[in-house]
């Protein structure tokens, strides 16, 4: 680590570990159990504390706060951690808080994500790869977000909710139920509006397969009879469609939340 990459006003606790070419800007504060891997850049006024690891090539902008204790009354100073992967862009005022005893003690963020201004990632969240969270997205604790999902600005997600891969949540949406993979949800109380067909096309999914999957989803959520029976019927009917299979797998997993449904 070259001292020329560390601004003279930065406060770095003894014990912090830096990789190669780490850059720390003015007035940053780094705790004693923080690990910054190669080419991490902290612009200025960034606070990183706790047992926290930041992956290589991640850039963090002013006034972000990473690794602070979770916002829960039952937190008892347990030594929980925050792990953030590589190639992330973390913009101004983003907060990512450490895990808790009730959630495995780790808040984990993957790689290649863009978190815009004011995003909050609560304790024990498990965040995937290649995501976009627009301005002021707020995630409560214990939320799981699959790869390539997009969450629109000022949306809030209820604790323990699952957001499936390639899904999209429109801006200003409160989400209190699980969002299926590829799902498109929005509204004052987030409802399923179909599949994220535009996003799927951009990611190279076959158009026919995507439209077939939309038909399958409509059969599951809008069909007659028992919901569980419809899942089984659709799983068999569309067993050769990998998109449908991914959605069915998601629906069959254990969850403490219900699912976002079409508006009745």
Curated annotation (Swiss-Prot):
Highest taxon of the lineage: Bacteria
Subunit structure: Homotrimer.
Pfam families reported in the protein's UniProt record: Acetyltransf_11, Hexapep
Keywords on record: Acyltransferase, Cytoplasm, Lipid A biosynthesis, Lipid biosynthesis, Lipid metabolism, Repeat, Transferase
HAMAP family attached to this UniProt entry: LpxA
Xref: Gene3D superfamilies: Hexapeptide repeat proteins (2.160.10.10), Udp N-acetylglucosamine O-acyltransferase, C-terminal domain (1.20.1180.10)
Residue intervals passing through the bilayer: none
Pathway info: Glycolipid biosynthesis; lipid IV(A) biosynthesis; lipid IV(A) from (3R)-3-hydroxytetradecanoyl-[acyl-carrier-protein] and UDP-N-acetyl-alpha-D-glucosamine: step 1/6
GO cellular component: cytoplasm; membrane
Functional summary from the UniProt entry: Involved in the biosynthesis of lipid A, a phosphorylated glycolipid that anchors the lipopolysaccharide to the outer membrane of the cell.
Annotated catalysed reactions: a (3R)-hydroxyacyl-[ACP] + UDP-N-acetyl-alpha-D-glucosamine = a UDP-3-O-[(3R)-3-hydroxyacyl]-N-acetyl-alpha-D-glucosamine + holo-[ACP]
Gene Ontology biological process terms from the UniProt entry: lipid A biosynthetic process
Higher taxonomy: Bacteria, Pseudomonadati, Pseudomonadota, Alphaproteobacteria, Rickettsiales
Record family assignment: Belongs to the transferase hexapeptide repeat family. LpxA subfamily.
PANTHER family assigned to the protein according to its UniProt record, in alphabetical order: ACYL-[ACYL-CARRIER-PROTEIN]--UDP-N-ACETYLGLUCOSAMINE O-ACYLTRANSFERASE, ACYL-[ACYL-CARRIER-PROTEIN]--UDP-N-ACETYLGLUCOSAMINE O-ACYLTRANSFERASE, MITOCHONDRIAL-RELATED
EC number: 2.3.1.129
Name of the featured protein: Acyl-[acyl-carrier-protein]--UDP-N-acetylglucosamine O-acyltransferase
GO molecular function: acyl-[acyl-carrier-protein]-UDP-N-acetylglucosamine O-acyltransferase activity
InterPro entries found in the cross-reference section: Acetyltransf_C (IPR029098), Acetyltransf_C_sf (IPR037157), Hexapep (IPR001451), Lipid_A_LpxA (IPR010137), Trimer_LpxA-like_sf (IPR011004)
Compartments where located: Cytoplasm
Organism per entry: Rickettsia typhi (strain ATCC VR-144 / Wilmington)
């Amino acid at each position: 680590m070259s001292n020329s990459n560390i601004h003279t006003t930065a406060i770095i606790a003894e014990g912090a570990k830096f990789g190669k070419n780490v850059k720390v800007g003015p007035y940053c504060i780094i705790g004693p159990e923080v690990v910054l891997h190669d080419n991490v850049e902290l612009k200025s006024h960034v606070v990183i504390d706790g047992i926290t690891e930041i992956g290589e090539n991640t850039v963090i902008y002013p006034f972000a706060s990473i690794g602070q204790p979770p916002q829960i009354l039952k937190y008892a100073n347990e030594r929980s951690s925050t792990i953030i992967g590589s190639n992330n862009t973390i913009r101004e005022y983003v907060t990512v808080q450490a895990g808790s005893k009730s959630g495995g003690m780790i808040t984990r963020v993957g790689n290649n994500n863009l978190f815009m201004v004011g995003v909050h990632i609560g304790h024990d969240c498990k965040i995937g790869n290649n995501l976009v969270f627009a301005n002021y997205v707020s995630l409560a604790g214990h939320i799981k977000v699959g790869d390539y999902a997009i969450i629109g600005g000022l949306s809030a997600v209820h604790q323990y909710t699952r957001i499936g891969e390639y899904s999209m949540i429109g801006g200003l949406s409160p989400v209190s139920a699980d969002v299926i993979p590829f799902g498109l949800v929005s509204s004052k109380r987030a409802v399923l509006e179909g599949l994220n067909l535009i996003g799927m096309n951009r990611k190279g999914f076959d158009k026919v397969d995507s439209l077939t999957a939309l038909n399958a989803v409509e059969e599951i959520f809008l069909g007659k009879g028992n919901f569980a029976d419809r899942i089984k019927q659709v799983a068999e009917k569309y067993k050769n469609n990998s998109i449908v299979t991914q959605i069915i797998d998601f629906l069959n997993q254990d969850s403490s939340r219900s699912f976002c449904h079409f508006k009745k």
